[in-house]
């Protein structure tokens, strides 16, 4: 990017999540200071010094690794103020910079022994088990130091690659190997724990295995074929992302920035801390103890037990409770691990990233608005004035009603008539979006033209309810205001409720006449048994146009179910169409009248239709007139 002021979202096209290599993990946490010193490894479990209340060096809140806890001030206080920007204190080794770097600078813990990543081991499906083509139970036995696994069978005739051995079985085989009469020259190699798992994964030649699987799939069927395809899919994904299977075993653990796992002092002098700090502390303590045991060449059984405990500590850090006992803190509350923080409804993604609160939005209960058009919604004035406040202030200043923003805000608080008039001008033609959770399909959020209403409830047209799966028993809906002209245009063109009549899933209409509309349409067009059709010629019931019938009905001269003769030159479908008219009458000038059951036609001497009167009810005229007007309007 040439312009350094471009916003962050313009710096990339997409986000891709892949396995991190050990080098990448080190890269995240390791930094070289301007004085050439390499920092990043967290080696001490301490957090802060309880006397000075300053972070401990090389601990979980170390200022040398993560940056200063106060803006432009080093740990020892030698350098203060912004003029020392970028200097590394020669006494404490802390870089003088802003404290907000503690929100993104990471550290790492170099593990004394490899550990398996619990997501890939205990996830469903278990990718480690699929890749190694071994049962998950067997893989767990290896990782948690219950069984040995054969890494190289050597010359031993009873052993084979990836075979599991108990402690006793391996001791017997060792006795055979080292017996005086042993003929085994090439000794078998066995392993245990995540180190053995890492070796097995390193031995996998992905391209060769994928080729072999494709050949096997071609000649197999049923359950076996499905299993082979499952394994091939995982291997193909590893090949496509250039990831190595052994990266599922960790040599170093990233330590997330300290401001994302804070430690705060309470009123009584006590401290409240994030659970992650306790989990990291367990890992560091066990890792340091293991390193010390390896240094002093402690017995294998003690070292192995410490490795297992390190594995369990890392499991708890990544996903507490996934395997084994859940690690609990004070008052027996399970500690929140990294997985707990990011997964679920209250997790980082759904709560803070997808479901974050946004500006220019509101929320209220919905009520029915029967007088609204389908593309309209009733927006409470109190809500509208808040949502459109910047637009209203801008227009008030532009129209010289007020001189500055402060005066405009005072005027808005008083809710003067001038303000309401300006608000009406602002919202005219400015669509808003209504959303009802859960938004399960595209039609869960639609655009409407707002109409100012009194009260505090949003009014909604009853026909758009099926799309939102809404009813009026206390449901709430959120309002969002599109700001940019492009956003407003998109909302109007693509999201307006009247443009979303068909369901995107099935193609069937999702907006259909319902309840009182269906009943009203039926009542309007129904024939009353007690109302009998009238003969043609009754002047009080004969009209020259549909409009005349409507006017007579509006003047209460006729009722909805009265029969009328009305002049209508369009096509008519008779319910009981006869082959011949009931009567035919020819006049001296050559014109001809044909009387049918529900119509009377007049033809000239050439047989061309001059006029047509139809027998119908007032309700049907009203219905027909309404439909014609609606079609003409579009």
From Swiss-Prot:
SMART domains: RPOLA_N. Its cofactor is Mg(2+); Zn(2+). The gene is rpoC1. In cyanobacteria the RNAP catalytic core is composed of 2 alpha, 1 beta, 1 beta', 1 gamma and 1 omega subunit. When a sigma factor is associated with the core the holoenzyme is formed, which can initiate transcription. It catalyses: RNA(n) + a ribonucleoside 5'-triphosphate = RNA(n+1) + diphosphate. DNA-dependent RNA polymerase catalyzes the transcription of DNA into RNA using the four ribonucleoside triphosphates as substrates. GO terms for cellular component: DNA-directed RNA polymerase complex. Pfam families: RNA_pol_Rpb1_1, RNA_pol_Rpb1_2, RNA_pol_Rpb1_3. NCBIfam families: PRK02625.1 (NF002729), rpoC1_cyan (TIGR02387). Its EC number is 2.7.7.6. One of its GO terms (biological process) is DNA-templated transcription. PANTHER family: DNA-DIRECTED RNA POLYMERASE (PTHR19376), DNA-DIRECTED RNA POLYMERASE SUBUNIT BETA (PTHR19376:SF54). InterPro entries: DNA-dir_RpoC1_gamma, DNA-dir_RpoC_beta_prime, RNA_pol_asu, RNA_pol_N, RNA_pol_Rpb1_1, RNA_pol_Rpb1_3, RNA_pol_Rpb1_3_sf, RNA_pol_Rpb1_clamp_domain. Zn(2+) binds at residues 74, 76, 89, 92. Signal peptide: none annotated. GO terms for molecular function: DNA binding; DNA-directed RNA polymerase activity; magnesium ion binding; zinc ion binding. It comes from Synechococcus sp. (strain CC9311). This is DNA-directed RNA polymerase subunit gamma.
């Amino acid at each position: 990017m040439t312009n350094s002021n471009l916003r962050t979202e313009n710096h990339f096209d997409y986000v891709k999540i892949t396995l991190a290599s050990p080098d990448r993990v080190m890269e995240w946490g390791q930094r070289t200071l301007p004085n050439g010193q390499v920092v990043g490894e967290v080696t001490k479990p301490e957090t802060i010094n309880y006397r000075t209340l300053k972070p401990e060096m090389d601990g979980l809140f170390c200022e040398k690794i993560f940056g200063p806890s106060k803006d432009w001030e080093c740990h020892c206080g030698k350098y203060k103020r912004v003029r020392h920007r970028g200097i590394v204190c020669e006494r404490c080794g802390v870089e003088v910079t802003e404290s907000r770097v503690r929100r993104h600078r990471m550290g790492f813990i170099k593990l004394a022994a490899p550990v398996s990543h619990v997501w890939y081991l205990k996830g469903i499906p278990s990718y480690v088990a699929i890749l190694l083509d071994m049962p998950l139970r067997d893989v767990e036995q290896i990782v948690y130091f219950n069984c040995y696994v054969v890494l190289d069978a050597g010359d031993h005739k009873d052993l084979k690659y990836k075979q599991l051995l108990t402690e006793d079985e391996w001791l017997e085989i060792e006795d055979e190997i080292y017996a005086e009469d042993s003929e085994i020259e090439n000794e078998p190699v066995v392993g245990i724990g995540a180190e053995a798992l890492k070796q097995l994964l390193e031995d996998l030649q992905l391209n060769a295995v994928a080729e072999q699987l494709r050949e096997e799939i071609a000649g197999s069927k049923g359950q076996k074929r499905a299993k082979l395809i499952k394994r091939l899919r995982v291997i193909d994904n590893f090949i496509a992302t250039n990831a190595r299977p052994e990266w599922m075993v960790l040599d170093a653990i990233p330590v997330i920035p300290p401001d994302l796992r804070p430690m705060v002092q309470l009123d009584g002098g006590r401290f409240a801390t994030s659970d992650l700090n306790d989990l990291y502390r367990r890992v560091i303590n066990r890792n340091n103890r293991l390193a010390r045991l390896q240094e002093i060449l402690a017995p294998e059984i003690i070292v192995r037990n410490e490795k297992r405990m390190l594995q369990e500590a890392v499991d708890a850090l990544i996903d507490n409770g996934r395997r084994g006992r859940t690690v609990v803190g004070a008052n027996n509350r399970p500690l929140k691990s990294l997985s707990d923080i990011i997964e679920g409804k209250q997790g980082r993604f759904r709560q803070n990233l997808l479901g974050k609160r946004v500006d220019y939005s509101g929320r209220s209960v919905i009520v029915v608005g029967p007088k609204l058009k389908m593309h309209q919604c009733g927006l409470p004035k109190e809500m509208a004035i808040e949502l459109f406040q910047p637009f209203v202030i801008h227009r008030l200043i532009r129209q010289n009603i007020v001189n500055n923003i402060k005066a405009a805000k005072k005027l808005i608080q008083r809710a003067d008539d001038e303000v309401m008039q300006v608000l009406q001008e602002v919202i005219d033609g400015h669509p808003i979006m209504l959303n009802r959770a859960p938004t399960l399909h595209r039609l869960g959020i639609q655009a409407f033209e707002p109409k100012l209403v009194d009260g505090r409830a949003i009014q909604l047209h009853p026909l758009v309810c099926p799309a939102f799966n809404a009813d009026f028993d206390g449901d709430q809906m959120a309002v969002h205001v599109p700001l940019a002209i492009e956003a407003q245009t998109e909302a109007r063109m693509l999201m307006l409720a009247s443009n979303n009549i068909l369901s995107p899933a099935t193609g069937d209409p999702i907006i259909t006449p319902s309840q009182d509309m269906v009943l009203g349409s039926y009542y309007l067009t129904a024939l009353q048994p007690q109302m009998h059709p009238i003969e043609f010629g009754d002047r009080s019931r004969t009209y020259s146009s549909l409009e005349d019938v409507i006017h007579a009905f509006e003047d209460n001269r006729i009722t909805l179910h009265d029969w009328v003769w009305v002049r209508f030159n369009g096509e008519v479908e008779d319910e009981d169409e006869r082959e011949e008219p009931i009567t035919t009458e020819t006049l001296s000038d050559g014109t001809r009248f044909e009387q049918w059951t529900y119509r009377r036609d007049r033809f000239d001497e050439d047989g061309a239709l001059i006029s047509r009167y139809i027998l119908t009810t007032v309700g049907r005229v009203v219905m027909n007139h309404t439909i014609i007007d609606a079609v003409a309007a579009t």
